[in-house]
Amino acid sequence: AYRTKATPLSVSRLAAAESATRATAEAMNDPLLAAQWHLVNRGDQFCEGGLIKSVRDADVQCEGAWQRSTGNEQVIVAVLDEGVFVDHPDLKANIWVNEDEVWRSRDDNDGNGYAGDRHGYNFVKSSGVISWNDVNDSGHGSHVAGVISAVNNNGVGISSIAGGSGAGDGVKIMVCQIFSGNMGAS
């Protein structure tokens, strides 16, 4: 569980390497990976309705990264954006969970000053309830969370940079909602 007074851990390269999962693009079975030219670009994809041909290797080099690691569940990445659809089938297994908190609770069970922060916190509404479907939201928070840690190799949707091997072992997403529709938090 998340603690605000935690002592930083020192992790050696060896320990980090041992806890990481590995794969290649060929091993991923996510149906939309072929359209994710920004992750793996073999130069055979077309963009803009087939008018623009992609450029081989004009990507973020995910194949090389995946050979080293597809993610590590001990890593928590905070997404500061609109809300994230925490129950999305391609995200749910990689959403951070604060075990001490209860979803939609108004109580601050862990004493960190944020009531109900089970998956993060909605700073716009000062609530642990994350909203992702406001009529004015664009879905950007869920999109960003998906690029970072959609569950890899689960036969659903997209692949991600650090979504693990498909066994819930990807980096965890902590939602820090700072935008909602036309509203923001500072």
Name each model feature, range by range.
Residues A1-I76, V86-N94, N122-S127:
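Protease zymogen maturation seam
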Residues S54, D59, E63-A185:
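Subtilisin-like serine protease catalytic core
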